[in-house]
């Protein structure tokens, strides 16, 4: 009779036990990693992890090294049975494309070292559990940095668990991902023939904010230059593109030669004065839309996040900086014209919040 404690010739482990051990390892090593545990709980967690590793070392043929892959997202369980209906329907959500992987396209970076973070916070990320437990949501600290979506175990991690460039993707709310109280907190980032990423936010409002910020960046990526409406362009630059016509004495007849007689130089001077007055009036109307800037509280805004202008006509500002809005004529494109410390330029309205509650 074989000795249960012997490790010289270990037998095979039943599939149910392997799956259960994989579930326990995922829960202890990954799920509890981002939780605030007591000292005693942490010691117990470390002890369980060590025991699991010992078992896997005794039965190396039963377990394959999954490396640093992201909790089952980046590999297939070699011990999983034939895929059921749920697995087949969800395969596209949980495995990478046949081409290059979405992950590991960017160098490792600590969560605290990310720059130009537009939106960040804890989300539940959906993954495929390669066992009888089916799907599972795991807590992840996510950050949208420029055009890359990063996800970490926590905001203290020194390296991301995964990331993907959002270019080519679309984002939308999806209340069919869950059947519990969080069903209205779900959204997904998807694209044809690409892996789908699904998340659950803390509240419906937080989920909508993620969707809005992602949509704003995706729309902004579609055009490097802000389009101009021809009518608006004509109205704004009417005094430059269409100068006041100067009549020539050779081509027109004076109304009354005896009363009105102007030399060409005088007509040109008069036209120049009119153009200067019109230009000055236009500038005054733009810089002071409400008359008195000092009391025009409705047009004072402050930065929600740091923003670095990529073009010369864009303002750069930091979170909390005060910006006075001169014009909202590009509102349809998500941009306003603002002034900060004497500098005037375009500012993304999504990066601003009202300074005064009027």
Swiss-Prot record:
Name of a matching Pfam family: SH3_1
Transmembrane intervals: none
Q: PROSITE patterns, per this entry?
A: PH_DOMAIN, SH3
Chain spans, region Disordered: 60-108, 227-293
Where is there biased composition of kind Acidic residues? 255-270
GO CC annotations?
A: cytoplasm; plasma membrane
Q: What is this protein called?
A: Src kinase-associated phosphoprotein 2
């Amino acid at each position: 009779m074989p000795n249960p404690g012997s490790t010289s010739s270990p037998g095979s482990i039943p599939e149910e036990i392997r799956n259960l051990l994989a579930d326990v390892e995922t829960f202890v090593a990954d799920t509890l990693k981002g939780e605030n545990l007591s000292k005693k709980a942490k010691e117990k967690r470390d002890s369980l992890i060590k025991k699991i590793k010992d078992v896997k070392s005794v039965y190396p043929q039963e377990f394959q090294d999954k490396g640093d892959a992201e909790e089952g997202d980046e590999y297939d369980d070699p011990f999983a049975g034939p895929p059921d209906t749920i697995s087949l329907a969800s395969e596209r959500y949980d495995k990478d494309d046949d081409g290059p992987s979405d992950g590991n396209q960017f160098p490792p970076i600590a969560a605290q070292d990310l720059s130009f973070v537009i939106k960040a916070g804890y989300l539940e990320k959906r993954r495929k559990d390669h066992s009888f437990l089916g799907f599972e949501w795991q807590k992840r600290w996510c950050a949208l940095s420029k055009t890359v979506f990063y996800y970490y175990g926590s905001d203290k991690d020194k390296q991301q668990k995964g990331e993907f460039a959002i270019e080519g993707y679309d984002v939308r709310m999806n209340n069919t991902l869950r059947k519990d109280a969080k069903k209205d907190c779900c959204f997904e980032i998807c694209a044809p023939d690409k892996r789908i990423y699904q998340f659950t936010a803390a509240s419906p409002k937080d989920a909508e904010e993620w969707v809005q910020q992602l949509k704003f960046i995706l729309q902004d990526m579609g055009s490097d230059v802000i389009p101009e409406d021809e009518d608006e362009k004509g109205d704004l630059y009417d005094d430059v593109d269409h100068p006041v016509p100067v009549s020539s004495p050779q081509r027109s007849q004076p109304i009354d030669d005896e009363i009105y007689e102007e030399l060409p130089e005088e007509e040109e001077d008069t036209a120049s004065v009119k153009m200067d007055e019109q230009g000055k009036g236009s500038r005054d109307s733009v810089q002071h839309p409400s008359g008195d800037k000092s009391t025009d509280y409705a047009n004072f805004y402050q930065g929600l996040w740091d923003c670095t202008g990529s073009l010369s006509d864009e303002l750069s500002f930091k979170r909390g900086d005060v910006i006075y809005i001169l014009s909202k004529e590009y509102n349809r494109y998500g941009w306003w014209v603002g002034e900060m410390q004497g500098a005037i330029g375009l500012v993304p309205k999504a990066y601003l919040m009202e300074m005064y509650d009027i």
